[in-house]
UniProtKB/Swiss-Prot annotation:
Ranges for region Disordered: 1-20
Protein's name in the database: Heat shock factor 2-binding protein
Gene: Hsf2bp
Role summary: Meiotic recombination factor component of recombination bridges involved in meiotic double-strand break repair. Modulates the localization of recombinases DMC1:RAD51 to meiotic double-strand break (DSB) sites through the interaction with BRCA2 and its recruitment during meiotic recombination. Indispensable for the DSB repair, homologous synapsis, and crossover formation that are needed for progression past metaphase I, is essential for spermatogenesis and male fertility. Required for proper recombinase recruitment in female meiosis.
Cellular component aspect of the GO annotation: chromosome; cytosol; nucleoplasm
Consequence of gene disruption: Male mutants are infertile. They have smaller-than-normal testes with no sperm. Female mutants exhibit a fertility with 40% reduction in litter size compared to wild-type females. They show reduced follicle formation. Mutant oocytes show a delay in prophase I progression with the majority of cells at zygotene stage in 17.5 days post-coitum (dpc) females.
Tissue: Expressed in testis and, to a lesser extent, in lung and muscle.
Region described as Interaction with BRCA2: spans on this chain: 87-338
Organism this protein belongs to: Mus musculus
Quaternary organization: Interacts (via C-terminus) with BNC1. Associates with HSF2. The interaction seems to occur between the trimerization domain of HSF2 and the N-terminal hydrophilic region of HSF2BP. Interacts (via N-terminus) with BRME1. Interacts with BRCA2 and BRME1; the interactions are direct and allow the formation of a ternary complex. The complex BRME1:HSF2BP:BRCA2 interacts with SPATA22, MEIOB and RAD51.
Length: 338
């Protein structure tokens, strides 16, 4: 037993010696001092280095946080703007849809109004054509003409007549309207009424004194219409001017109109025999009135389309031939070098 205990005590002591060896390291004093110095330096410098880096990192973090906060605010503002513009877009789309519906409704109303206006215009044209055709027929009576001129609407009627004929000619624009259309008949009837009124002395006097605008309009329209265009209207206007020329004041007024003589030559170039016939008769009125002829003789003789008139004097149309021959005889009588 004693031997056994003694062995155990020796083992424990050996262990303690081993533990003591592990706790200590044998270092030279010089190395220890150097190590101690370095440790002291590290202990002094490390906080400074760490503090500087930490401060820099902290500042960067602050900047990042500020930037992040600004970006968040900008994002929030963008979201608000988006919602605002989205609301405006929805409102605009709603307004646009409503306006489209309103425009569609207005367009339909406009189309309906145009259709109604067209129907009314057609009705008025038909009514005007019928009424004026009837009036044209009865205006060949002197009593009827006196009744027309005796009313307070005569001047207005002739003003409207001139405006209607002018509008009609402007609307042609090279197009050929149907000869039998209500519009044509309406305008022709108006021109026919003027012709019949001018065929009566009191009618000529009224037109010369009170309705010179109508005379100016007819002269203008005769120049506006192209050769061969709307010949019936040309003939009626020429007949009206011829009737007016029977009145001395009427003839004087017509011949003093700017461009009157060139207009006559222009009308003589028309291919329609009726237009040429009534132009010759109007020229003859000028030639047979000494006071008027003396004022236009020089211009008339210098520009007279003699060859055209000579050709008409040989026309197969007996009326045109006769009128041309009579004019040539009148010109020879006046020593016009014909």
């Amino acid at each position: 037993m004693a031997a056994t205990v003694g062995d155990g005590s020796g083992t424990e002591e050996a262990c303690r010696n081993m533990e003591s060896k592990e706790e200590f390291v044998k270092v030279r004093k010089k190395d220890l001092e150097r190590l101690t110095t370095e440790v002291m330096q590290i202990r002094d410098f490390l906080p400074r280095i760490l503090n500087g880096e930490l401060l820099e990192s902290f500042q960067k973090l602050k900047m990042v946080e500020k930037n992040l906060e600004r970006k968040e605010q900008e994002l929030e503002q963008l979201i608000m703007d988006r919602e605002h513009f989205k609301a405006r877009l929805e409102t605009a789309q709603a307004d646009s849809g409503r306006e489209k519906k309103e425009k569609l409704a207005l367009r339909q109303q406009l189309n309906e109004a145009k259709q109604q206006l067209l129907q009314q215009a057609e009705y008025c044209t038909q009514m005007g054509a019928v009424t004026c055709t009837l009036l044209w027929g009865v205006s060949s009576s002197e009593e009827v003409v006196k009744t027309i001129l005796g009313g307070d609407k005569a001047l207005k009627f002739f003003n409207i007549t001139g405006q209607t004929m002018e509008s009609f000619v402007k609307s042609l624009d090279g197009d050929v309207k149907e000869v039998d259309s209500d519009e044509n008949q309406f305008v022709f009837a108006l021109a026919g009424i003027v012709t019949n009124v001018a065929a009566i002395a009191c009618g000529r006097e009224f037109l010369v004194n009170s309705s010179r605008v109508l005379l100016d309009t007819m002269l203008q329209l005769l120049g506006d219409l192209k050769p061969g265009q709307c010949t019936k209207l040309k003939v009626l206007m020429l007949m009206s001017l011829y009737n007016v020329s029977i009145n001395s004041k009427g003839l004087k007024y017509i011949t003093e109109s700017p461009g009157f003589i060139p207009l006559l030559w222009w009308l003589l170039s028309d291919p329609d025999a009726e237009v040429c016939l009534h132009t010759l008769r109007l020229i003859q009125s000028v030639v047979l009135e000494p006071d008027v002829f003396s004022k236009v003789a020089s211009e008339l003789q210098s520009s007279l389309p003699l060859q055209r008139i000579l050709a008409m004097s040989k026309s197969r149309n007996s009326h045109l031939q006769s009128a041309a021959q009579e004019l040539l005889e009148d010109l020879r009588a006046l020593d016009c070098n014909v």
